[in-house]
Amino acid sequence: MYKLLTKDGMAKRGEFETVHGTIQTPVFMNVGTVGAIKGAVSTDDLRTIGTQVELSNTYHLHVRTGDKLIKEFGGLHKFMGWDKPILTDSGGFQVFSLAGLRRIKEEGVYFNSHIDGRKIFMGPEQSMQIQSNLASTIAMAFDECPSSVADRDYMENSVNRTTRWLKRCKAEMNRLNSLPDTINKHQMLFGINQGGVYEDIRVRHAQEISELDLDGYAVGGLAVGESHEEMYRILDAVVPHLPQNKPTYLMGVGTPANILEAVERGVDFFDCVYPSRNGRHGHVYTNHGKMNLFNAKYELDTRPIEEGCNCPVCRTYSRAYVRHLLKAKEMLGMRFCVLHNLYFYNKMMEEIREAIEAGRYKEYKEEKLCRMAEGE
């Protein structure tokens, strides 16, 4: 259940109660696609750096380890040693972006695995069944993820199908949560708003899915090629039509600047691979912008990645040492960068929550963006 604590303009400060603990929002979910953050980051590390929610992916866990095996283990929480909330993506985005030879039917999608080419079928019921086996805290509804350049007629048909699929997801989750062998009988369901950059289709879809009284609502199909301005325009149009007494989740977004702008528009949940992906390539986030530690100017730099940062890396190690590890292709260097980046994001969300509580979110956002744009 979502509890709105306070607002500053459209920015919301809330709490979301789940069977695995209360989530303080706005929140950034750390992405562990197959049950682990890429970059040799453990669940103990996640606890140390203040992670509230871990995100894993239904499609990847289904085609690799297998959700039935994970259910036998007692669910994803026990499997990966994590006792806080987990959100599982429905697999829809991966089916439409990774899998080959897709055939979209009313019943679902027929496709070939991107791992071994085997034929797989996934529809709303199958996605819910897999996520129930994983026993995640929050399950995402199975949706179609049309191309951002899809024409209007296709987008309207796609959105209508996504609504029908959402109703089937809700019915199947209710059925699964009533079964005696279901691990998490309190699994929550978030629906997903689609519609590309067509503002009127987005708004109509938001109004339709809001009537289904779900646990939360996501805005999907953004950050897939459109400009930042288009993304913010869609958020301005859509978020006011989603229930204000439920959390709003902007999927796959994004940069620190994206998050700061979206919070101001009323978004509560975020996820993105940027902190870990960039960290694995030696790019680290700081309050003065992004740094490339491969740059020669850091070769003898005795300072931490960011002075004043309390992450496990900055408390002990210098830029020069982390750069040395990266240049030597030591996994420790990659791990250090990922840890720092995730800590930076988690800390930024803490600052965001404090700024909303203090009624100075707009000032905080402008100061943060200005500092990050200045560079070192």
Q: Predicted segment positions?
A:
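Glycine- and acidic
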Residues: 147-151, 156, 216-222, 331-334
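Glycine-rich phosphate/ribose-binding loops and adjacent secondary-structure elements
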Residues: 163, 172, 176, 184, ...
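Conserved, mostly hydrophobic/aromatic
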Residues: 21, 54, 89, 131, ...
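Surface-exposed helix-capping loop/turn segments at secondary-structure junctions
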Residues: 172-182, 246, 352-364
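A non-catalytic, amphipathic alpha-helix used as a structural packing/dimerization or gating element
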Residues: 126, 130, 157, 161-168, ...
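Non-catalytic, usually N-terminal nucleic-acid engagement modules in DNA/RNA processing proteins
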Residues: 1-183, 296-299
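C-terminal extensions of enzymes
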Residues: 1-15, 23-32, 39-40, 143-149, ...
